[in-house]
């Protein structure tokens, strides 16, 4: 190849890379918070989809009207939220229905009910399918994300509750709150092909790393978490929080209901409802090592992270700087009232369209 052609090719690659960086750097980063996201309590943000500007101190931007009302016209508690950059849509489940909204027009495209109700769902990376758990019952529905129609049903008899789609789109992780086993479904066949566990008790919130080799699970009765090897299906470790006692909790009946990996997978953050704290663990060692704790404004029941790993978002509405461990903001609505929710997702906009979406779960994103 002639030198000038080589240089020209390099220049094109560099310009392309710069353009991609500029598009990402110039993106408007917004946090979408679904309400009511603490049971059906309206005092923590009312009803709707609240939008906050991440780069402007998490300032309140707007409230988008949503559906999800019961027969008396009162808001049902939100169970999950998921969004797709591929389709520009956002989905909200309540105890009875799932609603699909167009993010650009902010219009409701459809709302559908499913036999057995709904719980915390997960969407495929291409935005085409959603795995929707029934409300603590025996099955998951696999749903066409464009139409809301049911494609098939997966029966686990586990008290279906929480769902994570693997980043590669090949596996979906299905946790029921009446089973000590984490079920894993193959997304090509929509069948459970393997499990991880058993863990010491029924699984509550959980997370997985990017390579899908490890899972970290909350279980009933434990102030702490357990670690599972996804490859072998075996439980590896049990980690109990040191220096704090278990006690009564406002919700969930579980000492630790919320766990997440920082995107770089260097840390694991764990909720502690009774003590109104987040406990931080070094996840570069096994088992993860407890390193510090952060006091929050209320009892946390969930935690996730910004895509860049700079902020942690416990359900209390505190915004925590991951590096300094300091609370740097608190979510507030248009009236100045404190906002809390266990259902939130980060969405990036550029050129009038959605270019990237986060996840309601604090999943690992470390590139291998």
Summary of predicted features, one role per range:
Residues 8-17:
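Bacterial N-terminal signal peptides
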Residues 18-368:
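Predominantly soluble domains enriched in secretory-pathway, periplasmic, or organellar proteins
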């Amino acid at each position: 190849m002639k030198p000038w052609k080589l240089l020209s090719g390099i220049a094109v690659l560099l310009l392309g890379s710069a353009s991609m960086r500029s598009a990402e750097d110039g993106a408007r980063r917004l946090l979408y918070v679904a309400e009511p996201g603490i049971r059906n309590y309206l005092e923590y943000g009312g009803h709707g989809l609240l939008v906050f500007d991440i780069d402007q101190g998490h300032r309140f931007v707007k409230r988008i009207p949503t559906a999800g009302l019961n027969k008396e016209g009162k808001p049902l508690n939100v169970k999950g939220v998921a969004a797709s950059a591929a389709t520009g849509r956002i989905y909200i489940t309540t105890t009875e229905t799932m609603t699909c909204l167009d993010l650009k027009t902010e219009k409701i495209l459809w709302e559908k009910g499913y036999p057995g109700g709904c719980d915390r769902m997960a969407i495929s990376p291409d935005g085409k399918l959603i795995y929707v758990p029934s409300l603590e019952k025996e099955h998951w529905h696999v749903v066409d994300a464009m139409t809301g129609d049911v494609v098939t049903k997966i029966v686990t008899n586990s008290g279906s509750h929480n769902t994570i789609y693997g980043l590669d789109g090949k596996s979906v992780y299905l946790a029921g709150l009446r089973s000590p086993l984490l079920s894993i479904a193959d997304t090509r066949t929509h069948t459970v092909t393997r499990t991880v566990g058993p863990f010491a008790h029924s699984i509550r919130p959980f997370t997985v790393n990017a390579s899908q080799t490890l899972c970290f699970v909350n279980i009933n009765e434990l102030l702490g978490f357990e670690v599972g090897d996804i490859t072998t299906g075996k439980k590896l470790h049990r980690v109990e929080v040191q220096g704090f006692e278990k006690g009564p909790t406002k919700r969930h009946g579980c000492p630790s209901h919320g766990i997440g990996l920082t995107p770089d997978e260097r840390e694991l953050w764990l909720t502690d409802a009774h003590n109104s704290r987040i406990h931080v663990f070094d996840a570069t060692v096994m088992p993860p090592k407890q390193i510090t704790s952060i006091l929050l404004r209320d009892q946390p029941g969930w935690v996730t992270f910004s895509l860049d790993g700079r902020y942690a978002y416990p359900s209390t509405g505190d915004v925590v700087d991951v590096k300094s461990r300091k609370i740097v903001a608190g979510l507030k609505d248009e009236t100045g009232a404190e906002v809390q929710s266990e259902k939130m997702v980060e969405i990036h906009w550029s050129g009038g369209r959605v270019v990237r979406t986060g996840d309601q779960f604090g999943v690992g994103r470390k590139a291998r």
